[in-house]
Curated annotation (Swiss-Prot):
Part of the 50S ribosomal subunit. Residues 1-31 are annotated as: Disordered. InterPro entries: Rbsml_uL15_N, Ribosomal_uL15, Ribosomal_uL15/eL18, Ribosomal_uL15/eL18_sf, Ribosomal_uL15_CS. The lineage of its organism: Archaea, Methanobacteriati, Methanobacteriota, Stenosarchaea group, Methanomicrobia. GO terms for cellular component: cytosolic large ribosomal subunit. Binds to the 23S rRNA. One of its GO terms (biological process) is translation. This is Large ribosomal subunit protein uL15. The gene is rpl15.
Length: 140
């Protein structure tokens, strides 16, 4: 909007001298009037109000470190090279407790004979490891 044509007038198109002074001209600052006179506009724009969902207390929730069986199958030779796993009886023996991994999940393919020690296994991970001739040892 070209403002040159408003120059010389007292309020330059801002209405009366009382307008364009503070937030009262705009119905408040920020979210003021959010559940009152601004509510209908906000409803059509899709704003959400109020609390939603549930947060677990920090002492209950924790992050579980995981690895997939497909990744284990690929990493087994490298773990032996690094001294983090060993080969006994034609099987890769991997202790995931030493690596800080708590659970094994079943995504991927298992082609090698793996003997895995871990705190937890998903049903599909246990099934795939045992189908390839390996075994799952639950660490307690």
């Amino acid at each position: 909007m070209d403002t040159k044509k408003f120059r010389g007038s007292r309020t330059c198109g801002g209405g009366t001298h009382k307008n364009r002074r503070g937030a009262g001209n705009r119905g408040g600052r920020g979210k003021a009037g959010a559940c009152k006179h601004h509510f209908v506009r906000a409803m059509f724009r899709g704003y959400s109000y109020g609390k939603h969902g549930f947060n677990l207390p920090a002492e209950i929730s924790r992050d579980v470190s995981i690895v997939n069986v497909g990744e284990l199958d690929e990493l087994a030779p490298y773990l032996v090279e690094e001294g983090l796993a060993e080969i006994k009886d034609d099987a890769y023996h991997i202790n995931l407790e030493n690596l800080g991994i708590e659970k094994v999940l079943g995504s991927g393919r298992v082609m090698k004979n793996l003997v895995v020690t871990s705190e937890g296994f998903s049903a599909s991970a246990r099934e795939k490891i045992e189908a390839a001739g390996g075994s799952c040892i639950d660490a307690e």
